[in-house]
A protein has these predicted regions:
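Bacterial N-terminal signal peptides that target proteins for export
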Residues: 2-13
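Surface-exposed loop/edge segments in extracytoplasmic proteins
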Residues: 87-96, 214-222
Length: 505
């Protein structure tokens, strides 16, 4: 968590250097920087990004190019570009959507992708016109295993820790030295090939998860668990001394198998002095009502909640401001670490709870509150598809969030944690203002009946005058028990072994 005060002088110097280092030439993504050499047109963004793992099985493939696709290519796109399974080589049936007059393309699978499987894009011999085929062929990713159900849909083999970021980075970040090891702002996010038994999960002197410094002292931290995901968030910035992460005694929920003891030693990189920039989220839609995402073509800062129960018209619109901490850029020339501190809050508009999208349920969600549970970590990196100075830089962010609703009954149905939410986007400077356009997919549980899917088209803009930027809001409401299950009404229906669930505001 962030507890270091940042002076205005530090902010101005560090932010200016960071923008100069990573965002030089990014006046937009129009490719309008002239030079005497011919730069081939290329893919400049993909979600999932190359080598991304733990991709939700409901995720679309979002592409953006340095120039618009030719009409001939668009008319024949279903035969020129396919999404293919690595496992059997079969082509995935998708619906194609052209975005921003051909600058972008979205591929929406007609059914859920298989869990824990690898996929890639294939360009046929006809190609994509002026767009470099090899840049598109770099898009390869692996879907997340299931969070419930048969063990084979979660992952294969014995109970295994798949990764512990940032100790283990995805292939896109692994070769970048500035991103290949933890820093003093790091939160540790672990994913496993089986769901973790909550009764075996604890942090502390005798806990199954421990983080100790060079003196052997336990580092104060918070631990969050959801299915196959485990997050360890240090309460304070880590000191640049040797630390050891130990996991011992953790068990798989389905089989009871114990994880082999895990030990990793590292020295965090110091990121001071940092810049802190306040980014506006919620006022953008009101200021520019017709503004849509350049990546998805959807309205910005809305989270559609699409499911069989709710239909495909429900959404919550986000509002609020976020503070982003940026590491001292001269020390990180190839990947600048960034952080959104835990406790940051975004507000969401009420969600329409209509059965099958048509029949009113009588439930009123009220305002939806989304709280950043742990420090969200990420990087600003050079564009992985092109080294042209005219293309925008990549922004990557991993976050954990808690969602609650103001209404009592809906809160019991919708209140939940969403761990390991992976955000990918583009960072540009427009008229001297840092702008982030990003994409992510969340899969919240709906009414305890099914998992919904929400494609987040995120847009954030830094306030031009950071001296007068508003302070991001925190959730300062006193903690209250809002509902519980089985509750007073349904106790006669409770069975031995049923959990007691407490839902707070």
């Amino acid at each position: 968590m962030n507890n270091n005060p940042i002076t205005i002088h530090q902010f101005l110097i560090s932010l200016a250097v960071a923008i100069a280092a990573l965002l030089t030439g990014c006046g937009g993504d129009q490719g309008d920087v002239s030079n005497p050499w011919s730069t081939p047109e290329t893919l400049i963004f993909s979600y999932p990004y190359p080598g991304q793992t733990e991709v939700p099985a409901t995720a679309p493939v979002i592409l953006r190019f340095s120039s618009a696709l030719e009409q001939e290519v668009i008319d024949d796109i279903d035969s020129r570009l396919q999404l293919v399974s690595d496992t059997d080589g079969n082509t995935v049936m998708v619906d194609y959507q052209v975005v921003d007059n051909g600058r972008g393309l979205a591929l929406y699978p007609q059914s859920r992708l298989a869990p824990a499987e690898a996929y890639h894009l294939v360009v046929n011999d006809d190609g994509l016109g002026a767009i470099d085929d090899n840049s598109v062929a770099r898009v390869r990713f692996r879907t997340a295993g299931s969070q419930a159900g048969a063990s084979q849909t979660m992952g294969s083999g014995s109970f295994t820790l798949l990764s512990a970021t940032p100790l283990d980075q995805p292939s896109l970040l692994e070769p970048i030295d500035d991103a290949s090891h933890p820093n003093d702002m790091s939160t540790f996010r672990m994913s496993f090939n089986q769901t973790v038994d909550p009764t075996s999960t604890a942090y502390g002197e005798t806990g199954s998860v421990q983080l100790r410094d060079n003196l052997g002292k336990l580092v104060p931290a918070s631990l969050f668990l959801q299915g196959r995901y485990l997050t360890l968030d240090p309460d304070q910035d880590l000191k640049p001394v040797e630390h050891t992460l130990t996991i011992a005694g953790l068990r798989a929920q389905t089989t009871g198998e114990q994880l082999p003891e895990y030990n990793r030693t590292f020295v965090p990189e110091a990121t001071l002095p940092r810049a802190t920039s306040v980014l506006k989220v919620g006022s953008l839609g009101a200021e520019q009502p017709g503004l849509v995402s350049t990546l998805t073509g959807n309205p910005i800062n809305q989270v559609p909640v699409q499911s069989f129960v709710l239909g495909d018209e429900s959404f919550t619109g986000l509002s609020g401001d976020l503070a982003a901490d940026l590491a001292f850029a001269p020390n990180f020339p190839n990947a600048v670490p960034l952080r959104v501190p835990a406790g940051s809050v975004l507000r969401g508009t009420p969600v329409d709870v209509n059965i099958l999208g048509e029949i009113p349920s009588g439930l009123e969600t009220g305002e939806v509150t989304i709280t950043i549970l742990s420090d969200a970590n990420g990087y600003l990196i050079p564009n992985p598809f092109s080294d042209s100075p005219s293309v925008p830089r990549y922004a990557l962010l991993n976050m954990d969030a808690a969602m609650t609703a103001a209404g009592q009954e809906p809160n019991a149905a919708l209140s939940q944690n969403l761990l390991n939410v992976q955000v990918a986007g583009l960072a540009v400077v427009k008229d001297g203002v840092l702008v982030l356009d990003a994409v992510s997919v969340v899969e919240p549980d709906v009414l305890g009946l099914e998992k919904a899917s929400g494609l987040l088209s995120f847009r954030m803009e830094a306030y031009q005058n950071q001296r007068q930027a508003p302070a991001p809001s925190q959730d300062t409401r006193p903690l209250q028990l809002q509902s519980w299950a089985p509750g007073e009404t349904f106790q006669p229906n409770a069975r031995p072994g049923d959990p007691v669930i407490l839902n707070f505001n």
